[in-house]
């Protein structure tokens, strides 16, 4: 039951940077003992608001009220000492220090200038035990997993007696088990009466955790949902982007050309039975299946990331021998991989380099000198045409959002002579607005005659974008559905593992 008095209130918050109005008149309330989700597209203002709350930024207008008192923090340390902690996606810890030292950094117990390590480890151990973590406080942080690092960040907040804890995309680098543990801890913190702010693009997380959801759009407050029994995915999407869910996908019937890609009894590691399918020029075929269905494994095999062990791949009726990615690229088949950060981009290189890295071999001068003029023009062209949001082509790609990283990968392949594109989870970790832009790029590629084969575990996405849906189950094709006839019940029925009829 919602309390009558909010513990945290934002009152008319505005924030202006030179030439940019990031927030305008943001007002809403948060209550103790609740998880309050913040949702919106990239650039909607969520992170800016958290930075105001944590003392990184001062508001241009408005105020933050905590437990009835108007607060103003000069920096993050002042906010933390006042009980406000932000757990960012990029964790702010020191790998070479111990767990205990990280938890009490800035307030190490000491006497006469000498740290009392016995007391330090004891106090840190209590915080870790509070979180259900069996970790030696004297362990150097660098030996722990990312999920354990996150628990140390939370312990650090609890050591300051934080009453307000905000999580900014906390699950982006976690395993399924670590996510379950994080959710357990968040629910415990809620029971203790803390205010939990939670920022995520993942709808399933929002619905699993939240007691209330506030939506932002273009730096403005849109709506707060407080009755979680009455809110659904479609209502959230409409609030976030200002259009109906059907408009997000934007599928239209189209005509197709000749067969462009054909798999004839193809097998690869993780693909249990031979796979045969065809994709025509201008056709979008979606691969859907549950975890372990073999979608990603098939994609990797087709691109040469793993070895095809049987069967034949044809492009434009010509057999293609694919033993490594360069063979696939030479044949006109490109891949946007599932793990974008590990396999799709070179994080410490620029947007320009990431776009040009594949095609630059065709444009070198004298066989060995990079053609800077071509590279600048090519990168700028794709940044404009794909609406890649970046300060410039020389910006490190790791500083871009997931959606803009994905568009840069697409720009890379648009620089090649593309016949087939393989898209493996192309919108995972991307906000709704950026998804819409990715879908439009997919449609544009199809209109140019490219054969599109895309794998996704997001069933509404597959049903909304694909002309034809191929359902995989346990490494084999379980069935096909046409766009106009497909629904979630049919697709899930095909995707579910078979139940043995044997009687013990």
Curated annotation (Swiss-Prot):
List, alphabetically, the Gene3D superfamilies matched.
Answer: P-loop containing nucleotide triphosphate hydrolases
Q: Where does ATP bind?
A: 40-47
Annotated InterPro entries: AAA+_ATPase (IPR003593), ABC_carbohydrate_import_ATPase (IPR050107), ABC_transporter-like_ATP-bd (IPR003439), ABC_transporter-like_CS (IPR017871), P-loop_NTPase (IPR027417)
Signal sequence extent: none
Q: Which residues form the ABC transporter domain?
A: 8-243, 256-499
Q: Kindly list the places in or outside the cell where this protein is found, as annotated in its UniProt entry.
A: Cell inner membrane
Alphabetically, the GO molecular function entries are: ABC-type L-arabinose transporter activity; ATP binding; ATP hydrolysis activity
Tell me the domain of life. Answer: Bacteria
Sorted alphabetically, the keyword list is:
ATP-binding, Cell inner membrane, Cell membrane, Membrane, Nucleotide-binding, Repeat, Sugar transport, Translocase, Transport
Q: Does the keyword S-adenosyl-L-methionine apply?
A: no
Q: Which transformation does this protein catalyse, written as a reaction?
A: L-arabinose(out) + ATP + H2O = L-arabinose(in) + ADP + phosphate + H(+)
Q: Which GO terms describe its cellular component?
A: plasma membrane
Task: Note the topology in the membrane.
Answer: Peripheral membrane protein
EC number per UniProt: 7.5.2.12
- Keyword Coiled coil present in the record's keywords: the answer is no
Q: What does this protein do?
A: Part of the ABC transporter complex AraFGH involved in arabinose import. Responsible for energy coupling to the transport system.
- What family is it from? Belongs to the ABC transporter superfamily. Arabinose importer (TC 3.A.1.2.2) family.
Q: How does it assemble?
A: The complex is composed of two ATP-binding proteins (AraG), two transmembrane proteins (AraH) and a solute-binding protein (AraF).
Q: What is this protein called?
A: Arabinose import ATP-binding protein AraG
Corresponding gene? araG
